[in-house]
Amino acid sequence: MSLDTTEKQQLINTHQTHGTDTGSAEVQVAMLSERINRLSRHLQNNIHDFSSRQGLLKMIGRRKRLLSYMRSKSEQRYADTIAKLGIRG
């Protein structure tokens, strides 16, 4: 369920804040969201894969913590990231 190098680079290019940005909260949330989406599709087909389900819940928790950090630092960055990724209504 991991991302290969080209997919990571595409996510970084679309969500980076400046030219050399590879680890900002926006990029991390985008990568986690992509991994969460892939793992969710996997779990729809493999219902009894409980270890992957546990990993999914950990990723969701990590993304939630990153989003709350972004919200505390900059409401505008948070809103832009949510809108770009389409993860909350």
From Swiss-Prot:
Alphabetized PROSITE patterns for the sequence: RIBOSOMAL_S15
GO CC entries: cytosolic small ribosomal subunit
Entry annotated with the keyword Ribosomal protein: yes
An MF annotation (GO) of this entry: rRNA binding
Keywords, ordered alphabetically: Ribonucleoprotein, Ribosomal protein, RNA-binding, rRNA-binding
Biological processes per GO annotation: translation
SMART domains to which the protein is assigned, alphabetical: Ribosomal_S15
Keyword Ribosomal protein found: yes
Biased composition (Polar residues): 8-25
Region feature (Disordered): 1-25
Residue intervals passing through the bilayer: none
Subunit structure: Part of the 30S ribosomal subunit. Forms a bridge to the 50S subunit in the 70S ribosome, contacting the 23S rRNA.
Family the entry assigns: Belongs to the universal ribosomal protein uS15 family.
Function, in words: One of the primary rRNA binding proteins, it binds directly to 16S rRNA where it helps nucleate assembly of the platform of the 30S subunit by binding and bridging several RNA helices of the 16S rRNA. Forms an intersubunit bridge (bridge B4) with the 23S rRNA of the 50S subunit in the ribosome.
Name of the protein in its database record: Small ribosomal subunit protein uS15
Lineage of the organism: Bacteria, Bacillati, Cyanobacteriota, Cyanophyceae, Synechococcales
Gene that encodes the chain: rpsO
